[in-house]
Amino acid sequence: VDGFRFDLAATLARQFQEVDKLSAFFDIVEQDPIISRVKLIAEPWDLGSGGYQVGGFPSSWSEWNGRYRDTVRDFWRSQPSTLPEFASRLMGSSDLYQVNGRRPVASVNFITAHDGFTMNDLVSYNEKHNEANGEGNRDGESNNRSWNCGVEGPTNIPDVNDLRQRQMRNMFATLLFSQGIPMICGGDEVARTQQGNNNAYCQDNEI
């Protein structure tokens, strides 16, 4: 083990309910002779007020770059006004990290993760399909920035399947050529699907 990834890491910085970038937790980490020398990766947000802290962690940390994910998804589904921000994400997101002198390695670039759509589902579904979770399709994120390429779900239409394959190649190429640390969700490289389920933590099956 050469590092740790902290889920909902903004919670660790909360003191008196507010996110404090100078919190005691960060001081303890910086002073520890072992932990201060390993890779530290933050999911830099939580569910509380002011919890979205992308770009706000100390220089020794790398962060999941949620802005990268959203911008790349929007760009490849041809959303307007994304080109300038897409260029920033491609070049290491200096607008987020240069304030305190951080380099592109501060940015963990990703398009998909264990939460949400797989890459295949991102180009195959406009809407989540979480009915199998037993919550009336109310669970999971509704704004997925996805595009089904013209047909919802699996199809035998060659042009649609070709477009989906091209879209996945576009996103993979963007991820691998961007400055920063690329993160690929396991299974995306073989077009794994969760059949449109973007909250499949409770599915102990092929999904």
Region roles according to the model:
Residues 205-207:
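Short, intrinsically disordered, charge-balanced linker/junction segments flanking boundaries
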Residues 21, 25-186, 201-203:
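Conserved alpha/beta catalytic core and glycan-binding cleft of carbohydrate-active enzymes
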Residues 1-15:
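Active-site groove signature of glycoside hydrolases
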Residues 14-21, 195-199:
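Short glycine/threonine-rich loop-to-helix capping motif typified by GTGT followed
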Residues 10, 46, 192:
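Short, glycine/acidic-enriched loop or turn micro-motifs at the edges of active sites
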